[in-house]
Amino acid sequence: MSSTTTVAEFAAELNKPTATLIEQLTSAGVAKVQASDHLSEVDKQKLLGYLQASHGTVTAERKKITLVKKSTTEIKQADATGKARTIQVEVRKKRTFVKREDGSDLPAEEVQPEVVAAPQVPVIDDAELIRREEEASRHAELLRRQEAELAEKRRLREELDAKEAARELERQAAAESAKAAAEAAEAAKKAKPVTGKAKEVAQPAGAEASRAAAETAVAEEAAATKAADAAVVQAAAKAKATAEFQADAAKAQDLQERRRKAEAEAAGIRAMMSAPKRVLVPHVDPKAAIKGTLHKPAVAPGAAKPAAAAGAPGAPGAAGKKEVKSENLSSTWKDDAAKKKGIPSRGATAVPGRGNFRSGPRGRRSNDRDARPESTFVAPTEFKVIEVHVPETITVAELAHKMSVKSSEVIKHLMKLGQMVTINQPLDQDTAMIVVEEMGHKAITAALDDPEAFTDDDVQGQQAEALPRAPVVTVMGHVDHGKTSLLDYIRRAKVAAGEAGGITQHIGAYHVETPRGMISFLDTPGHEAFTAMRARGAQATDIVILVVAADDGVMPQTKEAIKHAKAAGVPIVVAINKIDKADANMDRVKGELVTEEVIPEEFGGESPFVGVSARTGEGVDTLLEQVLLQAEVLELRAPVEALAKGLVIEAQLDKGRGPVATVLIQSGTLKTGDVVLAGSTYGRVRAMLDENGKPIKTAGPSIPVEIQGLTEVPQAGDEFMVMTDERRAREIATYRAGKFRNTKLAKQQASKLENMFSDISAGEVKMLPIIIKADVQGSQEALAQSLLKLSTDEVKVQLVYSGVGGISESDVNLAIASKAVLIGFNTRADAQARKQAENNGIDIRYYNIIYDAVDELKAAMSGMLTPDKKEEVIGTAEIRQVFKVSKIGSIAGCMVTAGIVRRTARLRLLRDNVVIFTGELDSLKRFKDDVKEVKESFECGLNIKNYNDIQEGDILEFFEIKEVARTL
């Protein structure tokens, strides 16, 4: 379009009639009357402005532009605990440019930089705080308005009182004038004439006075009536004003109280917003009273000390006060003197009233009234029952302090109960409560004063969305039923061949990606010794796969696995393994499981039964489908973007890596560098490995990982959680360790009391002390339980120490001191430990299969048993002739009728088949030669030791006592 256009062209361009456009141009102030007139750009702008103004679409030109610039820095500042923290500081700069008329853009104003500190995490959300502050401000405004109204009422009431006081003064003045007039009239009435002349002269005056007096009396009576009415009205008004004043005062007090509460609430909200993070504070028992004595009353903490009752004479402010007697002053000196420790000297201690050998000069006795106590009589106090809060463990001294008695009294009562204790010995809760009840007080179980109450704060602050998670499946069953082989087929790996003896002795944790989703598997041992390990597996699981061999059926550990699964309340999927064998019988297995209350779905139960073969892989896909179907029914969810929580499945001490724990994450995400609290140990996660040994940085729910960096080896089965503060984690771990130690010591002491009488016969019992070192926590626990079960009434297994890790020099030293056998399960001794063990004759035994350890220890214990004595008859002889020899006695000539006769054997003398003597031989001869034995059908001569009453025809029965080794 050209710079100039005709009206007709512009109308055609706008699709408007030319007449309409000319009319609009005329209205806009552009003088165009013909279609051929030319239009410039200025004319078009005028037309546009007119049309926009007429239609209300005028856009005001922007006159001002504001620019905001932000910059963020960090500063370090100490918080309430004294720890340096990094605070984010945000600086906002605002600058505004205004377009002037002359066309220049100049900055109109520059706002000062606004420093905004990193916001504190509020306890209450911002909307709630704003609402509360607005409500508090409205409340305060209402109170101010009501106070203004009250002040106005008070001002009006004061003006009314002032007017009433003025009227009262006027009434009093009128009453006084009326009274004065009445007194004058009375005086005039009483006046009498002195003389008759005076009387005559005074008569007209008297009549006039009487008239005046009558008028005055009438006026006075009217004034009195009026005053009485006014007094009644005034009293009523005053009573009404008083009532209104009291009501207003009560209302003002109520308003003031409400205003104070509103201001306190607003101040509390502001303090809450600016309050520092909560820290641990030592617990103070609210029931602990501040105790004092009669002469020295207790002073509350923080209270000022009471001022002196009276000052010294001449002291400021002493004037006008009662004088203090000298004897009262000297009493304080006596107290100070009594507090001072006496100087030790030779001789007896001076007794008050009896003099001392170090008496005054010239043998005079000194006055010892000052040394005499005020009174030796102590008033008996009434017994007071105290509520004693007894924690889990408490020392004897602490218990005595809580009951306000001496420690010796508590020790006496414990001695009466048959327990010898010292003042610093810890008592368990049950024993302490018995002692408290025995001493007549009331024992209450104390609430735990532990820092663990703050562990939930971090978790509650993390409100993350719960997302679906993978199921955790535990494979359980009897030993050698094919649990690990089934998992091998699922994982396409060969793990069973790597286990010692082909049996599983650790919990294996794996996660498997299947086409239908991820599943985490826990493989538990089936051997009977690993009961606790199986229970931990059931505790951490969502679904249990119960593996039963089709050719073996339900066995003891199968029943135990069913009990664990039912106790944990998890669904059971039964996998009947080894169906490819010729002697497999699935119907028999189903019948046995029905007996154990595991009902298959085809019989109307809840447990799906799947036949599988770990060798060929038959039925494995169906088994996984059933597992995932059960997981869908359970709707398993867990928060992902939160602090990790889970369970310690296994723990061990690695020589190169230190304490290593296998954990199963149940919720949240575990990251490298997180501070972890697990039971009584803590640490920062230095490294994380998956089940294949590959390092990973993060792990989410249902993922088993191996973590390093803990300070000690945790207990298998402990819960672990991620803490935000390492200092708090250390505090809780230290507290738990001390609590565990105190509880353990107290239980040991309680067991000593129970075993007091059984220890009398303990000398007859032989002890086999052992020290166990295993590779992982679960194996150590299982081996210790299995070996302790071998104890009998004659030989007991004494577990000196059990731990995780290799055999060190300190273990050998402990074995030397306790004369114990060192057992290494999947561990070995280092060079120094081996050398020290050889030098001191310490027996170190290594095992990698739990059967071998149990069998060898059982054999060693069998060797310690006292052998049984068994009598064995070796031969008989008949006395054919008796010879009497002087100085020797009777010699029997015998014929050996059966067996053999030995010189060292014992014999019985039978006469008419009745034993009349049991003894031994003095000599045995054949012809003239001494012999050791004589065989059957040979003759011999023998002399019985210390016995001569023998006859022909007697039978001699020879026997030996043999020791037979016993077995457990």
Swiss-Prot record:
G5 as annotated region, ranges: 613-615
Region (G4): 577-580
Biased composition (Low complexity): 305-319
tr-type G domain: residues covered: 468-635
Record localization: Cytoplasm
UniProt xrefs under Gene3D superfamilies: P-loop containing nucleotide triphosphate hydrolases (3.40.50.300), Putative DNA-binding domain, N-terminal subdomain of bacterial translation initiation factor IF2 (3.30.56.50), Translation factors (2.40.30.10), Translation initiation factor IF- 2, domain 3 (3.40.50.10050)
Keywords: Cytoplasm, GTP-binding, Initiation factor, Nucleotide-binding, Protein biosynthesis
GO molecular-function terms, A-Z: GTP binding; GTPase activity; translation initiation factor activity
Residue numbers spanned by region G1: 477-484
One annotated Gene Ontology cellular component of this protein: cytosol
Pfam families assigned to the protein according to its UniProt record, in alphabetical order: EF-G_D2 (PF22042), GTP_EFTU (PF00009), IF-2 (PF11987), IF2_assoc (PF08364), IF2_N (PF04760)
Residues engaged in binding GTP: 477-484, 523-527, 577-580
Main localisation: cytoplasm
Job description of the protein: One of the essential components for the initiation of protein synthesis. Protects formylmethionyl-tRNA from spontaneous hydrolysis and promotes its binding to the 30S ribosomal subunits. Also involved in the hydrolysis of GTP during the formation of the 70S ribosomal complex.
Stored HAMAP family: IF_2_B
Family of this protein: Belongs to the TRAFAC class translation factor GTPase superfamily. Classic translation factor GTPase family. IF-2 subfamily.
Name of this protein: Translation initiation factor IF-2
Protein species of origin: Polaromonas sp. (strain JS666 / ATCC BAA-500)
